[in-house]
Amino acid sequence: RVLFRSVLSMVADGGGYGVPVNFVWDGARSVYIHCAPAGRKLTAIEQNPRVSLCVIGNVHLLPRIFTTEYESAIFFGEAHIHLSDEEKMRALHLLIDKLSADFKELGDKYAHMSFHRVEIIRVDFTEFSGKRKKVK
């Protein structure tokens, strides 16, 4: 199973602010990110919902030839918070399917039990760019 590294970036306190996140794609044009129900990330999104998500795939350092193989993509869009309870629970189930697929029943119980301690961010993307370097 591949777990991509990702960083959600936004503007906070007049400057750039990036945090590592777990995300799940909804199969269309949005991703969901889970977080605590309060904090700097949510405050920043309330002030300016325009964000980017940088996703880093496979990275291989090739020291013998002084280069690195990599793949990455950056997505730009608008973040939405204060989603309906139904959408939040659907997002939590998508995250469980992605991150804990072998524990769906337990994940469902946990999602219901901790629902009040979780916020969900939906990011709707408007554009993206990707880059890859593969050495032959």
Predicted segments with their positions:
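Cytosolic beta-strand hydrophobic patch enriched in CBS
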Residues: 7-12
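A sequence-level detector of short linear motifs
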Residues: 18-19, 33, 81
